[in-house]
Amino acid sequence: MVRLGPKKPPARKGSMADVPANLMEQIHGLETLFTVSSEKMRSIVKHFISELDKGLSKKGGNIPMIPGWVVEYPTGKETGDFLALDLGGTNLRVVLVKLGGNHDFDTTQNKYRLPDHLRTGTSEQLWSFIAKCLKEFVDEWYPDGVSEPLPLGFTFSYPASQKKINSGVLQRWTKGFDIEGVEGHDVVPMLQEQIEKLNIPINVVALINDTTGTLVASLYTDPQTKMGIIIGTGVNGAYYDVVSGIEKLEGLLPEDIGPDSPMAINCEYGSFDNEHLVLPRTKYDVIIDEESPRPGQQAFEKMTSGYYLGEIMRLVLLDLYDSGFIFKDQDISKLKEAYVMDTSYPSKIEDDPFENLEDTDDLFKTNLNIETTVVERKLIRKLAELVGTRAARLTVCGVSAICDKRGYKTAHIAADGSVFNRYPGYKEKAAQALKDIYNWDVEKMEDHPIQLVAAEDGSGVGAAIIACLTQKRLAAGKSVGIKGE
């Protein structure tokens, strides 16, 4: 085997022998504060299950538990050409998915940048721009036209209420969008109208959430998939429940969606424990919540998602500075800026391979104008490990809760998102947490009964597969939503 270029030296823990007693005391205090024991995780899981159940009840609860109207499992044998449309914050992605029928698929995709003025323009400007992109894509890949309209799955990652899979009423814009005349309206007919104006052979048959897409896409290729999760700027999970277990749908469903029918549920569980009953919040978590745009909401997300990990670190470092332990006689004005430390900070610090943590030294010098001593860097490294590990241990409580609720003893959990994919050692931290919850006597993480595995593309492939399943139901005259819709 030929290795190209220098091999990165292995990460070294480094000795704590040179750390003075007063700083060691602070490190031990932080360990106590941020360590989540196996026992604590089990109590969180128990409460999580009751909150998931509450979300499915008629009364509802903190966790929305939104029915995704995917009422069939993909078999992996589905075939055909399907389109997916993914409307993100800055780009529009169009994906052609050719399902091979043997748990396999091919994809072709184009990305289109959304012009800034569209974010605050008119409803017609937005939908006609999207329709033009679709036309360009179809003309390029089907120059001879198509024999019948292409079914399209639309990944719409904005809060929308759905009574059936081929409709979705926008509740409110997020991600910097503020387009009049869309909130409170069904987005599917708005898009379909512009598609028809340009005579494009496309039918929008499904509106989906990206987490539900992650679940379905991964199940198509891997029959052991039991859940789709996103661990990135936000956190979320989706799984299949059975209709008989969803109390809030009682009496609302047509006969062809029976009590034994599966139903994909988009949990939106970032709002777990908004009452602060079980999550081990520190004073730093309280500050983050109180100074956030929506205090008292998204409690679980604020302790686990990539958006907040750097900020938790920053608040701890500020506290240590104010108490006179670190960065003595230095200008820390940059460190005082809220959210100046994003997740790349703990990520780079945990990835620093050098004994004296040179990369961390550069990071603080270049970005924050702070000179650090080796001893300070050892504390910073320990803090990054504690914050990252706590996030992983809390995150898998959601996974464990769904597995226990559904009685899964073995499962592949299809995971996606920037933290899962890029944060160093995250997969190992999560695997260790699951091992601790269940007390498994298994050494290797690849032998664990429940494993986090890399997901398939949910917003592209997942949306296309859901379009395929929905198209089949519609063609057979079956329902795709509540009675009378």
Curated annotation (Swiss-Prot):
Organism, as annotated? Kluyveromyces lactis (strain ATCC 8585 / CBS 2359 / DSM 70799 / NBRC 1267 / NRRL Y-1140 / WM37)
Q: Where is this region: Hexokinase large subdomain?
A: 209-457
Q: Does the keyword ATP-binding apply?
A: yes
Instruction: Indicate the segments forming the Hexokinase domain, all copies.
Output: 21-468
Pfam families of this UniProt entry? Hexokinase_1, Hexokinase_2
Which EC main class describes this enzyme?
A: transferase
List the GO biological process terms.
glucose metabolic process; glycolytic process; intracellular glucose homeostasis; mannose metabolic process
Query: Which lineage is the organism of this entry classified under, starting from the top rank?
Result: Eukaryota, Fungi, Dikarya, Ascomycota, Saccharomycotina
Please identify the protein, giving its name as recorded.
Answer: Hexokinase
EC number(s) in its UniProt entry?
2.7.1.1
- Which InterPro entries does its entry note? ATPase_NBD (IPR043129), Hexokinase (IPR001312), Hexokinase_BS (IPR019807), Hexokinase_C (IPR022673), Hexokinase_N (IPR022672)
Q: Please name the GO terms that the record assigns under molecular function.
A: ATP binding; D-glucose binding; fructokinase activity; glucokinase activity; mannokinase activity
Q: Where is this region: Hexokinase small subdomain?
A: 75-208
Catalysis performed (reactions): a D-hexose + ATP = a D-hexose 6-phosphate + ADP + H(+); D-fructose + ATP = D-fructose 6-phosphate + ADP + H(+); D-glucose + ATP = D-glucose 6-phosphate + ADP + H(+)
Part of which pathway?
A: Carbohydrate metabolism; hexose metabolism; Carbohydrate degradation; glycolysis; D-glyceraldehyde 3-phosphate and glycerone phosphate from D-glucose: step 1/4
Q: Which residues carry this modification: Phosphoserine?
A: S15
**What functional role does this protein have?**
Catalyzes the phosphorylation of hexose, such as D-glucose and D-fructose, to hexose 6-phosphate (D-glucose 6-phosphate and D-fructose 6-phosphate, respectively). Has higher affinity for D-glucose. Mediates the initial step of glycolysis by catalyzing phosphorylation of D-glucose to D-glucose 6-phosphate.
Q: Where is this region: Glucose-binding?
A: 151-177
Q: Name one GO cellular component term.
A: cytosol
